[in-house]
């Protein structure tokens, strides 16, 4: 435990928070040097900006493929990915609000909607995963988003009650006073997520794997999310027991989630869909050329 404490005290890791971190340095000064630290904020902002820029760069081609494929669920998922990416970009750029006096309410609202949006994408993908294959009908869209909407609606309601009803600082980390009840709630939250990903991981390695899509990308996605949520669960449990190393470790998992989850989701789900569209177009072109007699000479 002494080694863990020394790691948490290291000047090269994410800075700890205090209630008045930006009281003397202002918004910019707090963002650069005090609220979480320069490295923490820079990684978040750069990763989110690069991903939004990539989405914008690919937007014309992606919209063209979506309109040709006419997959309702993919169109809706792509649109929601854009919305959540912009929310996450705002969240990453406004980190100083977390430790700026007077910004607690707006920070809680921004974090609540950003994390709920990202969780909606997670739950939607898991719900869609259990359908076995890509579906393009309105029924599949309704079923997937109905499940996700119910789960996220309940999650958002409970968090709002704890935030604004009981005054539990769910989204404001304070190293000077560890709120054990808050971290107990996060332990339950992370335990549920880790349990779901663990169940799917087990299914992929059991006789029930035929019920899931036979796609290596999905298996890798589940493995990464299981590891991330397992590590986050461990960090929350440590923090709930008063270990400052747990707070530092939780900060690392939070950075990884907000910086890299949306790109991981895109690579796993949408990029694969767009690649399939390219292959489908190549097959169509080949069939048309074959029907036109372009390959007759090869058989002579």
From Swiss-Prot:
The keyword Heme does not apply. Keywords: Cell membrane, Developmental protein, G-protein coupled receptor, Membrane, Receptor, Transducer, Transmembrane, Transmembrane helix. It is a multi-pass membrane protein. The chain crosses the membrane at residues 37-57, 73-93, 110-130, 152-172, 183-203, 222-242, 245-265. Expressed at low levels in seedlings. One of its GO terms (cellular component) is plasma membrane. Induction: Induced by the N-acyl-homoserine lactones (AHLs) N-3-oxo-hexanoyl-homoserine lactone (3OC6-HSL) and N-3-oxo-octanoyl-homoserine lactone (3OC8-HSL). Triggered by melatonin in leaves, cotyledons, hypocotyls, roots and guard cells. Induced by osmotic stress. One of its GO terms (molecular function) is melatonin receptor activity. It is found in: Cell membrane. Disruption phenotype: Small leaf size phenotype. Abolished Gram-negative bacteria-mediated promotion of root elongation triggered by the N-acyl-homoserine lactones (AHLs) N-3-oxo-hexanoyl-homoserine lactone (3OC6-HSL) and N-3-oxo-octanoyl-homoserine lactone (3OC8-HSL). Insensitivity to melatonin-induced stomatal closure associated with abolished melatonin-induced H(2)O(2) production and Ca(2+) influx. Reduced osmotic stress tolerance associated with increased reactive oxygen species (ROS) accumulation. Disulfide bonds: none annotated. One of its GO terms (biological process) is regulation of stomatal closure. InterPro entries: TPRA1/CAND2/CAND8. Its main location: membrane. Belongs to the UPF0359 family. Plays a role in plants and microbes interactions. G-protein coupled melatonin receptor involved in root growth mediated by the bacterial quorum-sensing signals N-acyl-homoserine lactones (AHLs). Binds to melatonin. Phytomelatonin receptor required, in collaboration with GPA1, for melatonin-mediated stomatal closure involving H(2)O(2) and Ca(2+) signals. Essential for melatonin-mediated plant response to osmotic stress probably by activating reactive oxygen species (ROS) scavenging ability. Interacts with GPA1. This is Protein CANDIDATE G-PROTEIN COUPLED RECEPTOR 2. It comes from Arabidopsis thaliana (Mouse-ear cress).
